[in-house]
């Protein structure tokens, strides 16, 4: 299948990183909902095709640009959510908790600008600001984006309450802060299908300064933090639970 021409600049990011020619990419997929994303990942896993997750390409490190031939998954199509009990719909991409108006569910394919525009009439805002308002929320979570406000308000990690993660074989995980916690350096996660994933966290000490190298790993950690900043190597996000602040 020829590569998509939907987003012709999508083989280069904001840092002008360019690796393969468009012709070397087997296929570009732009899923529009979770079911399509699950099927795309499941097929790629079955056929052992390399996958690159692509957002708005506002990054400067080339992480959204395919390094080798394979499948590009364009996440800009995941810009809406289904209804959820206990949440009221504000926008196709935003649901606000009825019990706690400072909590909400957000689609990964929505931009930072669109999210804060939707929150403004509610007298709410989302503090993380990586310096590019076109950046997608999913990309912010995948990179644990920070920026000029991080000294006062912290990085993206501080505002993530839940994640719905699609693993590379199509398995779905629902992660909630405070519920899914490691036992020392060991973890166990139950997938939506009932499969249990168990193992050991990386055995290294993270520096107590700003650091973007490797997966976040600490004893007794919230396992949601393993996926925040993982840059797509563990899975894709189909739904993101955020904490907001009052204006």
Task: Spell out what each predicted region is.
Residues 1-49, 56-103, 153, 239-246:
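N-terminal flexible segment immediately upstream of the FAD-binding catalytic core
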């Amino acid at each position: 299948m020829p590569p998509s021409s939907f987003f012709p600049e999508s083989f280069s990011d904001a840092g002008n990183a360019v690796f393969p020619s468009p012709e070397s990419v087997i296929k570009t997929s732009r899923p529009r909902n979770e079911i399509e994303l699950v099927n795309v990942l499941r097929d790629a896993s079955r056929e052992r095709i390399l996958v690159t997750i692509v957002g708005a390409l506002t990054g400067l490190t080339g992480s959204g640009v395919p390094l080798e031939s394979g499948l590009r998954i364009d996440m800009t199509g995941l810009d809406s959510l289904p209804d959820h009990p206990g949440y009221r719909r504000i926008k196709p991409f935003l649901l606000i908790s009825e019990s706690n108006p400072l909590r909400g569910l957000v689609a990964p394919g929505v931009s930072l600008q669109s999210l804060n525009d939707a929150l403004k009439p509610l007298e709410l805002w989302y503090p993380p600001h990586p310096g590019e308002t076109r950046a997608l929320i999913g990309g912010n979570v995948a990179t644990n984006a920070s920026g000029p406000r991080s000294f006062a308000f912290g990085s993206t990690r501080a505002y993530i309450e839940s994640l719905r993660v699609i693993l590379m074989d199509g398995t779905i995980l629902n992660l909630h802060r405070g519920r899914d916690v490691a036992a020392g350096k060991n973890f166990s996660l139950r997938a939506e299908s009932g499969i249990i994933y168990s193992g050991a966290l990386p055995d290294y000490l993270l520096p107590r300064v700003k650091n973007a190298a490797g997966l976040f790993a600490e004893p007794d950690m919230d396992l949601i933090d393993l996926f925040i900043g993982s840059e797509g190597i563990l899975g894709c996000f189909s739904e993101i639970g955020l904490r907001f602040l009052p204006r």
